[in-house]
């Protein structure tokens, strides 16, 4: 199996460029190999109706792809008048993942919107979105602290995500599109920096997988996510 010079346990080249857009409180271009996602964090001084008057905040996410982010053009979902099931699933996953590491009571009655827009897709767009959105969220929270709008940091720890799978009978880390398309098993792991799991998604595309294979994929995912935490920290230190 060819991985463009990568070992089975290697991430693709990872880049996180902060302040990629000037207007949002947080804006990051995250690159997992040829997958590129712009993640922005925008603060609004309001909360959803179910939280009004409760003194607590909210973190939510939206996800989309440019029409030609993939090999062939896809119509904009706005033109179709509805979001696809895949889009809804991914943006809910992003929102859940970031809420898992946020203390909403420290946000006050405000919402942070995480917008993840895929400008080029080559596998792992949801995992790249979660990983980049965390960095954007840190910048947005930092802006609130500097402005004196909040007095304590609501972020409890970091969160990141990576894909793993079984390709040609072998456990591999951080699948690109070609690998994902031929994978016998495809899994996504979302974890916090304390080593806890936020979400595990796994599907056998062909033969069912064994407990041993799942353990091998989990081990790879944990190794990869720990590396992603380092990339996040390095980006935030620049």
Swiss-Prot record:
Keyword rRNA processing recorded: yes
Coiled-coil boundaries: none
Record's catalysed reaction(s): tRNA(n+1) + phosphate = tRNA(n) + a ribonucleoside 5'-diphosphate
GO MF terms held by the record: 3'-5'-RNA exonuclease activity; tRNA binding; tRNA nucleotidyltransferase activity
One GO term of the biological process aspect: tRNA processing
Chain residues that bind phosphate: 86, 124-126
A Pfam match: RNase_PH
EC number(s) per entry: 2.7.7.56
InterPro entries documented for this protein: ExoRNase_PH_dom1, ExoRNase_PH_dom2, ExoRNase_PH_dom2_sf, PNPase/RNase_PH_dom_sf, Ribosomal_Su5_D2-typ_SF, RNase_PH, RNase_PH_bac-type, RNase_PH_CS
Keywords: Nucleotidyltransferase, RNA-binding, rRNA processing, Transferase, tRNA processing, tRNA-binding
UniProt keyword annotation of Nucleotidyltransferase present: yes
UniProt function note: Phosphorolytic 3'-5' exoribonuclease that plays an important role in tRNA 3'-end maturation. Removes nucleotide residues following the 3'-CCA terminus of tRNAs; can also add nucleotides to the ends of RNA molecules by using nucleoside diphosphates as substrates, but this may not be physiologically important. Probably plays a role in initiation of 16S rRNA degradation (leading to ribosome degradation) during starvation.
Stated family: Belongs to the RNase PH family.
Subunit and interaction comment: Homohexameric ring arranged as a trimer of dimers.
NCBIfam families, sorted: RNasePH (TIGR01966)
Protein name: Ribonuclease PH
Protein source organism: Trichlorobacter lovleyi (strain ATCC BAA-1151 / DSM 17278 / SZ)
